[in-house]
């Protein structure tokens, strides 16, 4: 949660015995960064972490992108006042279409925000034609969830490095390179050997998924030879 600390108005004398109100200084705007998949992106505070979770449970404000910790299971409570947004290529568990709207000409589906007994609230926005879903959650309030989801944008002149997870290709390097090219990005292939993975397996991506690039920029893929 981002906290804004207010400054109490002060009264001072102008020398004639008249009290003058000193206005509060305006709070500094929160510095933001954009993350996304393809042309769908969302603004998050720069101070947020990336994949700052334990077993997929955020322990501080964070954006979740291909979170490796989500594969583990442990019964951990979410700390209070922690906000997050997760990017996915499929509807999140529990997603339903409560409302629809148009975002920069793209159909969007909204799962209304709801809160559980443990005080964690969540809601989501899906862009089916772009295969991108944003799931925001908060142990602060439902209002924070709605605020997070209001920062989704469609950026025709920017391309977010897509997720490496796909049920269709199983982290196949060739299939992922094709996805990048379809989005207008170039690829550079680096290879390494492995006694664990089969040839063609995608093992690393640089820059990482979620990073916004300009069309024509290069993404380096490391695959097993």
Show which residues each predicted segment covers.
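Secretory pathway targeting signatures of secreted, lumenal, and periplasmic proteins
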Residues: 30-94, 116-119
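Extracellular/periplasmic catalytic domains that process cell-envelope and extracellular macromolecules
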Residues: 35-36, 125-128, 212-215
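Short secondary-structure junctions
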Residues: 47-56, 96-102, 107-114, 186-191
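Signature of long, low-cysteine stretches enriched in small and polar/charged residues
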Residues: 86-158
């Amino acid at each position: 949660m981002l906290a804004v600390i207010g400054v109490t108005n002060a009264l001072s004398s102008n020398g004639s015995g008249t009290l003058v109100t000193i206005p509060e200084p305006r709070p500094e705007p929160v510095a933001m960064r954009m993350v996304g998949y393809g042309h769908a992106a969302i603004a998050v505070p720069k101070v947020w972490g990336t994949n700052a979770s334990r077993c997929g449970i955020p322990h501080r404000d964070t954006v979740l992108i291909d979170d490796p910790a989500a594969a583990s299971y442990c019964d951990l409570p979410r700390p209070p006042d922690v906000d997050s947004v997760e990017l996915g290529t499929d509807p999140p568990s529990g997603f339903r279409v409560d409302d629809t709207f148009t975002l920069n000409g793209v159909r969007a589906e909204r799962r209304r925000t709801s809160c559980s007994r443990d005080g964690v609230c969540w809601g989501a926005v899906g862009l089916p034609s772009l295969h991108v879903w944003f799931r925001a959650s908060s142990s602060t309030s439902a209002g924070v969830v709605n605020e997070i989801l209001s920062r989704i944008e469609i950026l025709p002149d920017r391309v977010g490095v897509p997720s490496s997870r796909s049920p269709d290709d199983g982290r196949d390097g060739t299939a992922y390179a094709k996805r990048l090219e379809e989005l207008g990005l170039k690829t550079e292939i680096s290879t390494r050997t492995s006694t664990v993975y089969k040839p063609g397996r995608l093992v690393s991506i640089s820059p990482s998924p979620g990073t916004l690039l300009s069309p024509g920029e290069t993404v380096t893929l490391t695959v097993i030879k």
